[in-house]
């Protein structure tokens, strides 16, 4: 299905649970328990943090963009996995903490004879990821595409 609209609107609702924890919901999707990461006050290891959600959003958006470009070019993706690591640091210009660099290591396995064509689509996949376009962080994708 082709994208027709030039504006897409999404919503989420957060409900505070006390302390530093909350639950995020959106429609009929499963609720997502959130808290700070363990290295911050009130952080919990068993809940998603905004930092981890951001990295997951980058990974999944890049994957979906890559899959769409592969499908459009009749390429068969047989396996796909990614691992993102991001650095948050205080920026010199405004002294605010922010993600400054994110590295995403992507492993994809294509049908025989399709790896080279898939490699040609990585720039488009990166360009068309809405989440990447929405951040000022330096996003470095390291693609490992095999057959």
PLM regions with names:
Residues 1-56, 67-147:
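Extended beta-strand/beta-hairpin segments
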Residues 61-62:
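Alpha-helical metal-binding/catalytic segments enriched in His/Glu/Asp
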